[in-house]
Amino acid sequence: MKILIVSGFLGAGKTTFIKELAKRTKKEIAIFENEYGTSGVDGDILKEATNVNIWELTEGCICCSVKGDFAASILTIANTVNPDYLVIEPTGVAMLSNLIANLSQIEYEHIRLMAPISIVDALSIERYKNEFPEIYKDQIEFADTLVFSKTENLANEEKDKLNLEVSEINPNCKIITDHYSTLPD
C-alpha cells in the first residue's frame, strides 16, 4: 500500500484535489480524513463523488494528539482493505513534518510512504503566513510537490512571485501553478 499525504490549510482545495485524483486513477484507493467535529464534511463530499473507501477521524489531530489511534488505523486499513493507495488528508493546521515522522515509525513491509503534496491557496497565502507562520513554513518545507490552487485569474507575474516565495523555503520542491485538472494522469 502506497501512502500519499495531501496537506494544506482549510479551504485550500485538498478535497477537490483528492476527488480529481480518485476520478483519474484505475487503482483502488482508500482516503483517510482527519477533521475536527462530529462528522467530516469532506468525507461526505468524497463519498458522493467517488467509489473509494473513506476512513474518518474527527477527534484530535493525527500529527500530534492521536498518534497511536492513527498508526492503528493505518495498519487496520493495510490489513483489511489493502488498497493500492491510501490518501491521507490531514486537518488544515497539521504539521506535515510531524505526520511524516509518525508514518515513518510504522514498521510494516507492505507500506510505502510517497512524496507528500501540499495544496496552497494562492489567494490566501499572505493570511497563512501571518496567522500560522510555523505551520505555513512546515507545509511548504516538507512537501515534495506544491500545488497552487485558485490561480485561474492570476497574471504570470503573480505566479512567478509565488514560485519565488515558496522556493526560498523549499528550493527542491516541484511547483505547479496550473489547475490540477489540466495535469497529465
Language-model regions: role of each:
Residues 35, 89, 143, 149, ...:
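Residue-level signal for inorganic ion chemistry
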Residues 115, 144-145:
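Well-ordered beta-strand positions
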Residues 142, 154-185:
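C-terminal accessory "lid"/substrate-recognition subdomains
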Residues 2-7, 12-128:
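Nucleotide-state-sensitive switch-loop elements of NTP-binding domains
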Residues 125, 152-154:
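Short histidine/acidic/glycine/proline-rich micro-motifs that form metal-
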Residues 104-111, 136-137, 163-170:
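A short alpha->loop->secondary-structure connector
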Residues 80, 137-140:
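A short, aliphatic-rich alpha-helical micro-motif
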Residues 131-135:
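Charged helix-capping and loop-helix junction motifs
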